[in-house]
Amino acid sequence: MTPLSLDTASPDSLIHPISDSVLPPHPHAPPLIENPVFTGWDVLQIFGMTLFTMFVLQILVLFGARWLVYPGTNLGDLAQKPVLLLLSQFLIYAAVALFMMLVVQGKYHVRFWLAIRWNWPPSGWRLLALGGIMLFTLNLLQYFLPMPKDTPFEKLFARPRDAYLLSLIAVTLGPLMEELFFRGFLYPVLARRMGVAWGIFLTALPFGLMHMPQYGYAWGAVLVIFLVGVVCTAVRAAMKSVGASFLVHVGYNGTQMVIAAILTDGFRHMDKAGFLVF
């Protein structure tokens, strides 16, 4: 047999001299359901970075606002201003999103949207409709569960201008960042180690608990949010698409915002809105 010369050898044959077909199969090694490039430690780093950023930026925004815009105003009163809350929230989202990208692209040199399986789905309107259907279905639970009559979150809707700003966040940056962390980072790490069922459950659980302060630690409201998390994570698992779970989340929040705006005459009479769960 004539030896293969370097002049005639293809690049692939030099890089991979042994064909994959020659390698013996591994029947006892099933393919991983999820195999993200990042690890659980990376997810913990993102979580820690989020807490640190929340603490630092909220303080900076409050002191900056008192110095530049509201001189002499009590910090406790400033903390209740929706505009400042939204500003700090926007800055937190931007910082955390940048850190997420640095973890994926800087550490693993993989495109961010590919690594988290964004995979924008073709059936967008159906997923938005699924979110709306989920809202009407879960809304029935308020007749069987103890729901709070007054929540810290609803107080942010006291003025129409603030309500519209919050509604905008509720259908854009809010669900985007929550889906990126919970369904983009946390779920695939859990599913790889524990399987799909446990991955869905353990992703939805902290998703629900995270919203406890917004609803006065009422377990009925937290249970509803937990179920929203279950549905969104199940969609992510079934379609292998964070974009799909994002659309379901937007459909849920968006339907609720539209209904609330209609019932309250443009957020002017919030007492007619009923119970709001985002």
Tell where the protein language model's regions lie, with residue ranges.
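Interfacial segments of alpha-helical transmembrane regions
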Residues: 115-133
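Alpha-helix capping and helix-coil boundary motifs
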Residues: 71-74, 107-111, 123-126, 159, ...
